A protein has these predicted regions:
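A short, exposed helix-loop element centered on a Lys and neighboring polar residues
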Residues: 113-114
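Conserved glycine-rich cofactor-binding loop
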Residues: 11-12
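Rossmann-fold cofactor-recognition segment
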Residues: 46-59
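Active-site loop of short-chain dehydrogenase/reductase
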Residues: 3, 74-75, 120-134
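Conserved NAD(P)H cofactor-binding loop of Rossmann-fold oxidoreductase domains
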Residues: 81-87
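Conserved glycine-rich Rossmann-like NAD(P)H-binding loop of the short-chain dehydrogenase/reductase
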Residues: 27-39
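Substrate-binding pocket helix/loop in short-chain dehydrogenase/reductase
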Residues: 89-90, 94-102
Length: 136
């Protein structure tokens, strides 16, 4: 059986590199992002599927996993990589922008991990959830 990976928050940096590595190892790759148009070149390069998803929206995350179930079943690996860089001193940060960054990084990560765990634990897979706070 072919192993599979779902990469949420896919883009042109780290997640693209991880997608290439996974594809080179023979894994089936699904890329998820708010803007899937930006993923078209990578999609073609690694023969991936793409799904539009806002990781901070419960309905969008639920839809992502229902679509993923149809494409690859329960993924063997889920990578959560969305981020929002804040930059600057904590003294000068706009609290609304900080909230958005934490919402994307932590709450979105929780929503994805929860849906992934519901599927992956049925297959005795390990689930590791490590939210990383935005860089300040």
């Amino acid at each position: 059986m072919t192993e599979s990976v779902l990469i949420v928050g896919a883009g042109s940096g780290l997640s693209a590199s991880l997608g290439r590595v996974c594809a080179s190892k023979g894994m089936r790759v699904v890329l998820a992002a708010r803007n899937i148009e930006k993923l078209q070149n990578l999609k073609k390069e690694i023969d991936a599927d793409t799904i539009k998803c806002d990781a901070t929206n419960i309905k969008s995350v639920s839809s992502l996993f229902k679509k993923t179930d149809k494409i690859i079943g329960a993924p063997n690996l889920v990578i959560y990589n969305p981020s929002k860089s804040l930059g600057g001193s904590i003294v000068d940060l706009d609290p609304k922008k900080a909230y958005e960054a934490i919402n994307i990084t932590c709450y979105g990560g929780f929503l994805i991990a929860q849906q992934a765990a519901k599927r992956m634990l049925k297959n005795n897979a390990e689930v590791f959830f490590l939210p990383v706070l935005p860089q300040v």
